[in-house]
């Protein structure tokens, strides 16, 4: 069963030899530890393309429209693949300057989209330009790794590498409090980094793409 936000905070408090709480918002200190848990969560989620963070954002194009919002993607995602499933095409990523020239210089061709480039933000979500401008309805699939939102409710759960997040939050707690004769903050951080490496290695064995080495 996944670890809740409250359980993670209490785990860190216990390691710091502090009193556990019934809600993260109970004391100023438990709220601070909650901040550290969220900081550690972001660090861990950004460290690897975790399977639990995979999402597919779907777009159905409109004829003559080249710009779309990836609702639910946020801004800190990582792209795995983008497909035009209607035309059975893997879409290629263009740099922003090239896409701007394609969309603004000369007569715009309208056909099945084959290229994309990210362009701006709307409502906290990334926007994307596609080219050629669609001449009808095409189903586009953006396969992304999307970090989870910050934990705020006691019942929210951690998604990836829970022991690592707790260990790194504990290390942050040690830095804030100062040394007290127990594990030093540098030792706690080193242990957290080693744990993170182990979790990444274990996750990587489940996916063949993480075991390929390509000469460059």
Regions found by a protein language model. Give the residues of each.
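Glycine-enriched, solvent-exposed interface loops adjoining structured elements
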Residues: 1-216
């Amino acid at each position: 069963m996944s670890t809740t936000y409250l359980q993670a905070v209490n785990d860190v408090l216990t390691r710091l030899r502090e009193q556990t709480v019934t809600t993260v918002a109970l004391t100023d200190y438990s709220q601070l530890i909650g901040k550290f848990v969220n900081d550690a969560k972001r660090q861990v989620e950004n460290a690897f393309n975790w399977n639990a963070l995979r999402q597919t954002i779907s777009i159905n194009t409109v004829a003559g429209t080249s710009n779309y919002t990836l609702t639910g993607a946020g801004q800190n995602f990582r792209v795995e693949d983008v497909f035009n499933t209607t035309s059975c095409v893997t879409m290629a990523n263009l740099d922003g300057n090239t896409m701007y020239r394609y969309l603004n210089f000369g007569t715009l061709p309208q056909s099945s989209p084959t290229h994309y480039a990210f362009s701006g933000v709307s409502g906290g979500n990334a926007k994307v330009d596609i080219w050629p401008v669609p001449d009808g309805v095409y189903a586009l699939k953006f396969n992304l790794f999307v970090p989870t939102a910050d934990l705020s409710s006691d019942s929210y759960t951690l998604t990836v590498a829970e022991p690592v997040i707790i260990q790194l939050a504990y290390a942050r707690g040690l830095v804030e409090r100062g040394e007290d004769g127990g594990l030093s903050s540098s030792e706690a951080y080193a242990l957290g980094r080693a744990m993170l490496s182990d979790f990444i290695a274990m996750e990587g064995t489940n996916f063949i793409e993480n075991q390929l080495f390509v000469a460059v």
